[in-house]
Amino acid sequence: MLDKIWYRSKPNLLSRVLQPISLVFIDIANKRKIKQQLKQYKSKIPIIVVGNISVGGTGKTPVVRMLAQQYLAQGKKPAIISRGYGAKADNYPFEVTSGTLATQCGDEPAMLFDALQAQVPIVIAPERVQAVKYIEKNFPDTDIIISDDGLQHYKLARDKEIVVVDAIRMFGNKLCLPAGPLREPIERLKEVDQIIVIGNCSDKDKELLKNYKNVTYAKVVATEFVNILTAKKVAKTEFNHQNVIAIAGIGNPTKFFKTLEESAINITAKKVFKDHHKFTQSDFEGIDSDITVVMTYKDAIKCKNFAKANWWYLDIALDINV
């Protein structure tokens, strides 16, 4: 229901009714920001925060992965911190290792650890400052720390802020919660160092973005399919015009389905689960075992223990400045 009222070009009646509450939300958020900034922790290691000003999936984690890969290619030593949404670690800060389950560290950290082939330290903590201090102590030669989300975590000083925007949803009706999808007023964009817009942006929205500096356009591109059971990799054309069942338990499943369709794949059925869904074998009961199942990387991480031979995930990359 909220999606229907939030993602309109103009606020509807319900949004207008909720606006007074949004003003209270903004006031509380501003006071919290000021309070946190007064006791901000400043690390000697440069910190990049990759976040957003709206709720829901915008594509932050692919950006974090891309940045880490770029730094590795340059011979630098990056580290990643995350809140670890949904994590149930025994204690914090918690370092992700090869034996860590997604239930312990959260979906995104587990996926990033797998995608970066254990080359990058990943530490989670609800209080990100704890994660930074852990890296400072245990990985003192770290060149840069990338924070996956945390734009509004003002307890932590940052050297660069990157905001990720979904080109389709953009900023919705441009109102703050609960009248709209924004965590902070849209004017916050004037303070950040870079804005990365992912997807096909309309000319109208591009005009809006001219008001802000350092806007970069990117597109999610399919790179290859990876078998969840065997880790075998095949070209993205392998499933051209084949029938598949698409599974998604992410913040914005429409983006995933669109990427599949752009790869000339015939989706015979779509199964959508809530973001961060904890998959079990029972979720796949009733699915025709003869039809190929394709899901996101983030979902595949949680299905390894019961995956079938014809289950695959689609790996992606960002094509910048398309």
Swiss-Prot record:
Pathway: Glycolipid biosynthesis; lipid IV(A) biosynthesis; lipid IV(A) from (3R)-3-hydroxytetradecanoyl-[acyl-carrier-protein] and UDP-N-acetyl-alpha-D-glucosamine: step 6/6. One of its GO terms (molecular function) is ATP binding. Pfam families: LpxK. InterPro entries: LpxK, P-loop_NTPase. It comes from the Bacteria. Its EC number is 2.7.1.130. ATP binds at residues 54-61. The keyword Ion transport does not apply. It catalyses: a lipid A disaccharide + ATP = a lipid IVA + ADP + H(+). GO terms for biological process: lipid A biosynthetic process; lipopolysaccharide core region biosynthetic process. Coiled coil: none annotated. GO terms for cellular component: plasma membrane. NCBIfam families: lpxK. Belongs to the LpxK family. Transfers the gamma-phosphate of ATP to the 4'-position of a tetraacyldisaccharide 1-phosphate intermediate (termed DS-1-P) to form tetraacyldisaccharide 1,4'-bis-phosphate (lipid IVA). This is Tetraacyldisaccharide 4'-kinase. It comes from Francisella tularensis subsp. novicida (strain U112).
